[in-house]
From Swiss-Prot:
Protein family according to the UniProt entry: Belongs to the cation diffusion facilitator (CDF) transporter (TC 2.A.4) family. SLC30A subfamily.
Residues annotated as transmembrane: 11-31, 36-56, 81-101, 114-134, 247-267, 307-327
This protein's encoding gene: SLC30A1
GO BP annotation list: defense response to bacterium; detoxification of zinc ion; intracellular zinc ion homeostasis; zinc export across plasma membrane; zinc ion import into organelle
Name under which the protein is recorded: Proton-coupled zinc antiporter SLC30A1
Record localization: Cell membrane; Basolateral cell membrane; Cytoplasmic vesicle membrane; Cytoplasm
């Protein structure tokens, strides 16, 4: 609540200042014909929308408890808010770019540059205040939320209740949510007797809320996972991603204010306009009065020329520079938030090296259906099928596998153990718990049917192979011929009296 309260106060303060100043800039830009100020006012409008989105995302992201409709809570709300803010900012950049191109074709003279200068300085002060409020969100901090689930256990939330350690070898531990001690350990809430996969007991009257008065049964393979104390003090990277979008909006607005101030100063000191009562010609754009300059000169009347012309092109040029800077700073935010929502493998995870280390674990015969994705921020989740030799040694193998995932920064893992059946070979049947044939197309990476002969008395199950595992097998083994890749179809001929031969697939 403390972090939410601080961010909420900053966002509300910046929202009020931004909205009031946006209205002021729109009025002044129309009166003075300043493109830079008009662009900055549009940017202010985008900032208002960004701050509203950030407030909503920040509020929803506090609801980290699991529900029957959302087993991960609203952790990804801030990632979605960051993506929306990045899209807003990108669209705003293109709108400013089109307006700048129009000003290159038809330049306009700025009216009342001192007024523009005053408003620009005031806007710069507001944006500097915003940068001071959100400067600690300009980068990312590392966060590690641990959660493990091996075998038949489900996922817990990244931040579960603190539980008290018991004697070694104890499997079931009852802990009241309010208990705390100096030797506390943090782990996920894993409850075996509930329908919620995240292990939270739900109130029958209100399924959306967990029951706070019940004791929580925690069972993690007989051992509690010890977490470092500094994990609770670190701020979640998902919130950093959302607030970074706000910071980029404020930074872009500050750049716009700087452009307004510079353009107003240059125009005030360099531009020589026409005074009232004097005949003046502006050579910077077509003027029908130019045709009469020679006639007027023959009468020895004084003719003045406005200029220099480059001052009129400074405004759109600086706007183009601002657009380039904003796009350069927004692209990483847009890319990162989109990749998180697309559930791609985090860039800091070397998936091939991870598979290699898992296969090198003693007691592991095969690794397949390995999937790694990023839930939000630094909360990385992994699932895998691990084939082991002996069920009795699985617990030791699971601890080693857990350490391998920890070393790669993956702290929320679900391992499906598979034990080799008698006479089976890992290279022939990589998955002992294959999916049914009718659900093959609904898996993450599809299925590959296993060829079998007609002599087999039992049906051979469909073999499920992940895309990465299939690519690794193709790299290690020589390519098969086209005929060998075709699944074998078995036709059984039954000799029935007075009946035609019957075939079955």
């Amino acid at each position: 609540m403390g972090c939410w309260g601080r961010n909420r106060g900053r966002l509300l303060c910046m929202l009020a200042l931004t909205f009031m100043f946006m209205v002021l800039e729109v009025v002044v830009s129309r009166v003075t014909s300043s493109l830079a100020m008009l662009s900055d006012s549009f940017h202010m409008l985008s900032d208002v929308l960004a701050l509203v989105v950030a407030l909503v995302a920040e509020r929803f992201a506090r609801r980290t408890h699991a529900t029957q409709k959302n087993t991960f809570g609203w952790i990804r709300a801030e990632v979605m808010g960051a993506l929306v803010n990045a899209i807003f900012l990108t669209g705003l950049c293109f709108a400013i770019l089109l307006e700048a191109i129009e000003r290159f074709v038809e330049p306009h003279e700025m009216q009342q540059p001192l007024v523009v200068l005053g408003v620009g300085v005031a806007g710069l002060l507001v944006n500097v205040l915003g940068l001071c409020l959100f400067h600690h969100h300009s980068g990312f901090s590392q966060d590690s939320g641990h959660s493990h689930s091996h075998g038949s256990h489900g996922h817990g939330l990244p931040k579960g209740p603190r539980v008290k350690s018991s004697r070694p070898g104890s499997n079931d531990i009852n802990v009241a949510p309010g208990e705390q001690g100096p030797d506390q350990e943090e782990t996920n809430t894993l409850v075996a007797n509930t329908s919620n996969s995240n292990g939270l007991k739900l109130d029958p009257a209100d399924p959306e809320k967990p029951r706070s008065g019940d004791t929580v049964e925690v069972q993690v393979n007989g051992n509690l996972i010890r977490e470092p104390d500094h994990v609770e003090l670190e701020e979640d990277r998902a919130g950093q991603l959302n607030m970074r979008g706000v910071f980029l909006h404020v930074l872009g607005d500050a750049l716009g204010s700087v452009i307004v101030v510079v353009n107003a100063l240059v125009f005030y000191f360099s531009w020589k306009g026409c005074s009232e009562g004097d005949f003046c010609v502006n050579p910077c754009f077509p003027d029908p009065c130019k045709a009469f300059v020679e006639i007027i000169n023959s009468t020895h009347a004084s003719v003045y020329e406005a200029g220099p012309c480059w001052v009129l092109y400074l405004d759109p040029t600086l706007c183009v520079v601002m657009v380039c800077i904003l796009l350069y700073t927004t692209y990483p935010l847009l890319k990162e938030s989109a990749l998180i929502l697309l559930q791609t493998v985090p860039k800091q995870i070397d998936i091939r090296n991870l598979i290699k280390e898992l296969r090198n674990v003693e007691g592991v015969e095969e690794v397949h259906e390995l999937h790694v994705w990023q839930l939000a921020g630094s909360r990385i989740i992994a699932t895998a099928h691990i084939k082991c030799e002996d069920p009795t040694s699985y617990m030791e193998v699971a601890k080693t596998i857990k350490d391998v995932f920890h070393n790669h920064g993956i702290h929320a893992t679900t391992i499906q153990p598979e034990f080799a059946s008698v006479g089976s070979k890992s290279s022939v049947v990589p998955c002992e718990l294959a999916c049914r044939t009718q659900c093959a197309l609904k898996q993450c990476c599809g299925t590959l049917p296993q060829a079998h002969s007609g002599k087999d008395a039992e049906k051979t199950p469909t073999v499920s192979i992940s895309c990465l595992e299939l690519s690794n097998n193709l790299e290690k083994k020589p390519r098969r011929t086209k005929a060998e890749n075709i699944p074998a179809v078995v036709i059984e001929i039954k000799n029935m009296p007075n009946k035609q031969p019957e075939s079955s697939l």
